[in-house]
A protein has these predicted regions:
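Positively charged, low-complexity intrinsically disordered leader regions
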Residues: 2-46
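Short acidic-hydrophobic, aromatic-tinged amphipathic segments that line or gate anion-handling sites
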Residues: 25-29, 126, 240-242
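N-terminal catalytic cores of NTP/NDP-binding nucleotidyl/phosphoryl-transfer enzymes
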Residues: 27-90, 189-203
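An acidic- and aromatic-residue-enriched active-site/binding cleft used to recognize and process polar
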Residues: 51, 82-84, 128-130, 194-196, ...
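Divalent metal-coordination and catalytic microenvironments
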Residues: 57, 109, 228
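Short secondary-structure boundary/capping segments
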Residues: 63, 93-97, 142, 235, ...
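Divalent-metal (Mg2+/Mn2+/Ca2+)-assisted nucleotide/phosphate chemistry catalytic cores
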Residues: 89, 94-219
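Conserved nucleotide- and phosphate/pyrophosphate-binding catalytic cores
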Residues: 179, 185, 197-419
């Protein structure tokens, strides 16, 4: 992909920098904190954290675009590879794998940013365990835990931490650590998905209680998955992996939920709106994004859209079919993924780390259990039905009965035996 626009920080006023920082976001908490930092003419320090659990998918393009905006606005950006968080989240990443997954995430994120033309030299990557096991951090965790209730901690992580029937204590520690990261990374703002809102609120309400300043919080919308609902790394039917091949991308898109005329909850349209258009804007000198649908001539020929609103209007009015929309997304997405796939194929370290981070599952063949009671039982081991005596169940020894040659003889002998 072509490099991004050449607008520099010095070309932007504080107001323009604020508009760029907050563009395409769903919500901003405490925007005045951001404005006051920009008014001081100093760079806004912001961090985005990601827990290295499942393989990163195409939904990661959404925060990557915002990182590009932050950098262009002159922000100092930190990417937190939250390895301890990955372990705390109901053991989504076992300890023996989490280090490899953190490295894999770093390689993938850098490749994605290069693919959309973002200079990565100004990014700072930090591994959570590099400071979260220190004495000062642990003591701050104790202090924070002394003022946050179990109810509030559980509520904060409800949309982020995996919910199970018997919640683990680790799920309550998770949101407290995410709040503390703001202080220990020395930032002015934290960025994340809107699903992080309750954790952001917990941080804003409780950090001042242990003597730390309140931060601003920036939230991007959550892109619906291909099957509807949230795009998730744990649901293979909801997402396209960043290293999926062209045929896999085509297959997943063709199977995706994309009802004619329906815009709300349509994962394919949302992907165009929140990924393809913003990336196209990054690459254009004038910041104007375009999305091309390669339609057959008999259906009107190729059509170019300059905005998501324009595309949605045509889709609602059935001027754009689901199949044509999917073809356009397939073509644009494969162009985005090509340099990422090439990075992987040409980098032996990348391949090795991927193997270590996500080892192939070994299927263990289950042994058939021997059915009890079907084998031969020696004569001296035979027992009759169990007999209850004084509340204690005792097996009776088997009694052999010669039943004779007639029904009358058998009944008489059985009656005598029972006496």
């Amino acid at each position: 992909m072509a490099s991004t626009k050449t607008t520099t920080t010095t070309d932007l006023t504080p107001e323009e920098r604020y508009d760029l920082i907050t563009s395409n976001l769903q919500e901003v908490l405490k925007p005045n904190i951001i404005k006051s930092v920009l008014a001081e003419n100093r760079p806004l320090k912001v961090y985005w954290g990601t827990a290295p659990t499942g393989r990163p998918h195409c939904g990661y393009f959404v925060p990557m675009v915002k990182l590009a905006h932050f950098l262009r606005a002159g922000c100092e950006v930190t990417v937190l590879l939250a390895d301890i968080h990955a372990f705390l989240d109901n053991l989504k990443a076992p300890l023996e794998l989490v280090t490899h997954r953190a490295k894999y995430y770093e390689l993938v994120i850098k490749s994605v940013l290069r693919a959309i033309g973002v200079p990565i030299e100004k990014l700072r990557f930090v591994l959570g365990s590099s400071y979260q096991q220190g004495a000062a951090y642990v003591m701050d965790l104790f202090r924070l835990s002394s003022i946050v209730t179990e109810h509030d901690a559980k509520k904060a992580g409800a949309e982020v931490v995996k919910q199970v029937a018997s919640p683990l204590l680790s799920g309550l520690i998770y949101p407290l650590m995410q709040a503390l990261d703001e202080e220990h990374l020395g930032v002015d703002a934290q960025f994340g998905g809107v699903d992080q809102r309750k954790i952001f609120t917990l941080a804003a309400e409780n950090l001042p209680g242990i003597g730390f300043k309140e931060r601003a919080h920036l939230m991007n919308p959550m892109v619906p998955g291909l099957a509807g609902g949230k795009m998730s790394a744990s649901d293979p039917n909801s997402k396209i992996d960043l290293l999926d091949g062209e045929e896999v991308v085509r297959s997943k898109l063709r199977k995706s939920h994309c009802a004619p005329g329906e815009v709300e909850g349509n994962g394919v349209i949302s992907f165009v709106e929140y990924v393809l258009f913003p990336i196209a804007e990054l690459a254009d000198e004038k910041g104007e994004g375009k999305f091309v649908v390669p339609r057959d001539e008999k259906w009107g020929g190729p059509v170019t859209y300059s905005s998501a609103a324009e595309l949605k209007k045509d889709y609602k009015e059935d001027k754009l079919s689901p199949m044509d929309l999917k073809r356009g997304v397939e073509e644009a997405l494969n162009k985005l993924l090509d340099p990422i796939r090439k990075d992987y194929e040409q980098d032996e370290e990348f391949k090795k780390v991927a193997e270590l981070a996500y080892p192939a599952e070994v299927k263990v063949k289950k042994k058939k259990e021997k059915k009890i009671g079907t084998g031969y039982v020696p004569k001296d081991k035979k027992t009759t039905a169990e007999k209850v005596t004084d509340g204690v169940i005792k097996p009776q020894e088997a009694v052999e009965v010669a039943v004779g040659t007639s029904a009358k003889d058998a009944q008489d002998k059985l009656a005598r035996t029972a006496e």
